[in-house]
From Swiss-Prot:
This is Energy-coupling factor transporter ATP-binding protein EcfA1. ATP-binding (A) component of a common energy-coupling factor (ECF) ABC-transporter complex. Unlike classic ABC transporters this ECF transporter provides the energy necessary to transport a number of different substrates. ATP binds at G37, H38, N39, G40, S41, G42, K43, S44. CDD domains: ABC_cobalt_CbiO_domain1. Pfam families: ABC_tran. Belongs to the ABC transporter superfamily. Energy-coupling factor EcfA family. It is found in: Cell membrane. Its main location: membrane. It comes from Streptococcus thermophilus (strain ATCC BAA-491 / LMD-9). The keyword Cell membrane applies. It comes from the Bacteria. One of its GO terms (cellular component) is ATP-binding cassette (ABC) transporter complex. The gene is ecfA1.
């Protein structure tokens, strides 16, 4: 669905090094790929290049079999929905409902289908009760939900989330991440998320680590979390279940290799307790 080949980019020619230096990777159709790394590693730059908001110095970006060029940028943007960390710049409607409907009106969708999509999108993100509210009167987390709803209603082939859940509380973030996964499954949407959130990473199929503008690794979330203390050097926290698993292993209470999810850890503990 997305193929990146030998991408190089710097914001100005005075930079001594590239922001992205010979980056190559691909995203499969219907896949959820998370991109992680320290601030300044090139994560958001990658998202903006794919969305045609920046122009690479060299390399290729291919979206759905079509190379991104000046001639194709608008066709490719039509396939991509992007949600950024600060959603205020994305609001255009007087009410939440109007804002979510804005893109659909521009596409000329029939009224009944437009109403159906708006209601479905707002329900997905838990904002139906706020449909008549002015976006400016919402909290930061609520604004992010509405911004995501506006993109979901358009049903793009690709959803790019650039720290889009960062302003939500932990419970709200988990609910929204699950909603995005439900949407991905329902519509076969490809998801690319720029994130530091471990729950978001855990939901993805694969994780790409950027380090100083280069691809450090591409792996499954389980393989990444198994790296333990290395995660801190990559700009991530160590999952609670990984810390607890290591402590229990050190005390001889469980016997396992690699990373355990919280569910797997509970199962290991039940197995241990049943033998006491």
């Amino acid at each position: 669905m997305i193929e990146i080949k030998n991408l190089k980019f710097k914001y100005n020619q005075d930079q001594t090094s590239y922001t992205l230096n010979d980056v190559s990777f691909h995203v499969k159709r219907g896949e959820w790929l998370s991109i992680v790394g320290h601030n300044g590693s090139g994560k958001s730059t990658t998202a903006r290049l794919i969305g045609g908001l920046l122009v690479a110095d060299s390399g290729q970006i291919i979206v759905d079999g079509q190379e991104l060029t000046e001639e194709t940028v608008w066709d490719i943007r039509d396939k991509i929905g992007m949600v950024f960390q600060n959603p205020d710049n994305q609001f255009v409607g007087a009410t939440v409902e109007d804002d979510v409907a804005f893109g659909l009106e521009n596409k000329g969708l029939p009224y009944k289908e437009m109403v159906s999509r708006v209601q479905e999108a707002l329900s997905f993100v838990g904002m139906m009760d706020f449909k008549d509210r002015e976006p400016a009167r919402l909290s930061g987390g609520q604004k992010q939900r509405v911004a995501i709803a506006g993109i979901i209603a358009m049903r793009p082939s690709i959803l790019i989330l650039d720290e889009a859940t960062s302003m939500l509380d932990p419970e709200g973030r988990q609910e929204l991440i699950q909603s995005i996964e439900d949407i991905r499954q329902q519509y076969g949407m490809t998801v690319l998320s720029i994130t530091h959130d471990l729950d978001e990473v855990a939901m993805s199929n694969r994780v790409l680590v950027l380090k100083q503008g280069k691809v450090e690794s591409i792996s499954s979330p389980r393989e990444l979390f198994s790296r333990g203390s290395e995660l801190v050097d990559l700009g991530l926290d160590i999952p609670f279940s990984a810390l607890l698993t290591q402590k229990l292993k050190n005390q001889g209470l469980i016997d396992c290799e690699g990373y355990l999810t919280e569910k797997e850890l509970v199962e290991q503990l039940w197995e241990y307790l049943s033998k006491m």
